[in-house]
Design a protein with these regions (language model features):
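Mature, structured domains of secreted/extracytosolic soluble proteins
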Residues: 1-206
Length: 206
């Protein structure tokens, strides 16, 4: 039911050598190095613990993730109404940076979100943009060892994608400007709903 979301997330998966794990456990396995599966550029939601250092007690006990996972149907519907309009013919063609920002819109990091907090308008994604979630759309509520998973059958347009920089995520021919703006670390400034902007977006050819 949520395999598309998982596949998109796993498309950023990498195995990273972990010195802490290697020092503690590699010898017991008869190897020199142990690797940890992480998601490059995204929160490592596949890891039970936020750090492999058992000495970092504060981080181990305080960090959790809350994921609002759209169903396969919801993602397909969003693709048809957003990315297909922007010139993409399939989800597999969507630019990785646009997908990265898309996934971030459904992650609340740092602490656990309880059901009564959803829909209050106070939740922000890890990128600092408001999380637009209608509690009535949630059909799965699962507590996990490292946070909470909420499943939903519909997607309200993510706030960053409805902002002035939304066309950068949507249109294929705006990808060059998306990377330029992303490299400047200014995207989060333009997704704020506290200020109004007018943005002129050059195409790749320009």
């Amino acid at each position: 039911k949520y395999s598309t979301f998982l596949d998109l997330y796993d498309s950023f998966g990498v195995y990273v050598a972990d010195d802490e794990l290697s020092k503690s456990y590699a010898k017991a396995y008869g190897v020199d190095t142990l690797y940890q599966y992480q998601h490059g550029g995204l929160p490592n939601i596949a890891c039970e613990w936020p750090t492999s250092s058992y000495l970092n007690f504060t981080l181990l006990t305080a960090t959790a993730y809350s994921i609002f996972a759209p169903s396969n149907t919801a993602i397909n519907h969003f693709f048809d109404n957003f990315w297909k309009v922007g010139g993409y013919s399939s989800l597999g063609e969507v630019d990785p940076l646009a997908l990265n920002y898309f996934l971030y819109q459904f992650i609340y990091g740092g602490s656990l979100v309880f059901p009564e907090e959803i829909g209050t308008g106070k939740l922000e994604s890890l990128l600092g943009s408001p999380i637009n979630i209608n509690p009535a759309m949630l059909n799965e509520k699962i507590m996990c060892v490292n946070g909470a998973l909420y499943g939903m059958n519909e997607i309200q347009e993510p706030s960053a994608f409805a902002s002035v920089v939304g066309p950068l995520f949507q249109y294929r021919d705006a990808r060059s400007f998306l990377y330029a703006l992303g490299g400047s670390s200014l995207i989060s400034s333009y997704t704020s709903n506290l200020v109004k902007y007018i943005m002129l977006v050059p195409t790749a050819d320009q």
